[in-house]
Regions:
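Glycine-rich phosphate-binding loop of ATP-dependent small-molecule kinases
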Residues: 1-199
Length: 199
């Protein structure tokens, strides 16, 4: 891929219910970049009857645990390759979620992508939980929007994903937004960050 333009990637991280998907939707509507949700790709693959990974993904989602990085990276890679977006700029939400994810990404994707940094949706556990439960009650159709799985997901976020955010922070590559605000306010903060990274 040395002659072709590399994909540019901004990871979007935060706890479950921090507003990652909502913020990505605002950004894609304004700028035309591509939003790839690792969770959505896994949920789609889970329902694909031809997928060799469906059963395995289903088990991880129900238990609130992290799917093997090879699976997630292959789904992200496929989605980026299939995209006809002229910008070649991707918001990847909900990934990387642990050190294994970073190692796997570096092994498989580092030749194809330039990582611009992490857009960190900073939100309290209480607000995150309330949003997810409201989303579940409103019929999100997500099997992981219930209190029991949410507790596990939040625990996984604290133990596995927060250290990843700290890892990028040491490189000066974390851009924080206060995602406890209304979505349009969060978006205003994000626009300044996008200008800063040259997007």
């Amino acid at each position: 891929m040395s002659t072709a333009k590399k994909f540019e990637v901004l990871f979007v991280l935060g706890g479950p219910g921090a507003g990652k998907g909502t913020l990505c939707r605002y950004i894609t509507e304004k700028y035309g970049y591509v939003h790839l949700s690792a969770g959505d790709l896994l949920r789609e693959e889970q329902t694909n009857l031809d997928s060799q990974y469906g059963e395995l993904i289903n088990r991880h989602i129900k238990e609130g645990t992290i799917v093997r990085v090879e699976i997630t990276c292959s789904l992200l890679d496929r989605a980026m390759q299939m995209s006809d977006n002229p910008h070649k700029r991707f918001l990847i939400d909900g990934f990387p979620r642990n050190q294994d994810n970073i190692d796997g990404w570096n092994k498989v994707m580092s030749e194809k992508c330039i990582v611009k940094g992490v857009l960190f949706c900073d939100c309290s556990k209480e607000v995150c939980t309330e949003r997810c439960l409201n989303r579940g009650a409103a019929g999100s159709g997500r099997t992981d929007d219930n209190e029991e799985v949410l507790a596990k997901r939040h625990e996984t976020y604290i133990t596995s994903t927060l250290p990843i955010i700290e890892h990028f922070e040491k490189q000066g590559a974390v851009y924080k937004v206060n995602s406890m605000q209304a979505p349009d306010k969060v978006f205003e903060e994000a626009k300044e960050i996008l200008t800063e990274i040259g997007w």
